[in-house]
Amino acid sequence: MINSFKAEFHCFVVAHNNVDDYRICELNVGNELSSLLPYFEQFDTYELALARVPVEFRPNDEQL
């Protein structure tokens, strides 16, 4: 099942499964994020979104 999240304002969204899969996406107003991951959390800044992701699942510098 594909879940979706539609941005109402510019934001960063953490999509995750509460276990070991976390994705951070930047969305603008009206843009939609579709994912197989069941949970979406919205944050105002990338730093706040990154803080939500457990340390062991955060991207390293080469992935940014």
Where are these regions (language model features)?
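A short, charged, amphipathic alpha-helix used as a generic interaction element across diverse proteins
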Residues: V29-L64
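Short N-terminal "domain-start" leader segments
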Residues: M1-L33
